[in-house]
Amino acid sequence: GPSLSLSGDVSSIDLSVLSGLSGMDMAGRLSGRFVVNGSREDPYGAADFTAQDGEIHGISFDRIEGHVSLGDQLATITSLHLEGPDGKHTVKGTVGLFAPHPLTLTIDTDKTRIEKLLALAGEDYPVTGWVENTMTVTGTMEAPQVKGDFLAFDGSVMGELFQSISGEYTYDGNDITLKNGLAYIYDGTAIVSGTVKPDMIDMDVSLNDISLSRMLPGRGADGKVNMRGHVSGTMEDPVFEGPISSRQISV
């Protein structure tokens, strides 16, 4: 193809003009400097950029700073920092320039809203709170594979407040698989591992010193219980099967 030899500066251009190119809704003002050589089929170069007061795929930002290099048909993100009202994100790694756009990314999130991350993934689970998260993203832009570890705090699951929840997870675009999950909830602790699908739960759980009055509000039950078993059903209507033990229960 024809050769490329481009360089220039941009100042406060509207990010929305890049929405079609990136495949994501974008807003804000972009400034930067770039150099691109090679060809359309094999470009190489680099860019430094900043963006202010905008949004990328539902994530609001006050400021973005980044450096990207082009080569070997990849965009290599050597540094990208996003700061906004919902937290801070740092991104490093590579994105393929051409379909299917292979991904190798590491994303560190410092105190952001769980609801925003779920919305970014196109999910709507009844979970709120703050989360610190480290994830790696592989696969392709059309079919990303995500794995990571997280610490969530000061939030709720299905309306029940929790102090903190931590664990390791994978996400394949449809199912979330959790390993070594530890939650401080219902005035006790919960250890969970398994899979959550949009229409089904398949998890092994161990609940220790759980408050019945917190877990079953309005049912007249009181006391502390230990439960070990399996949870099925859905997020809206979970079903627990397994033994229950307690030193004292009042109903």
Regions found by a protein language model. Give the residues of each.
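Interface amphipathic segments
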Residues: 1-251
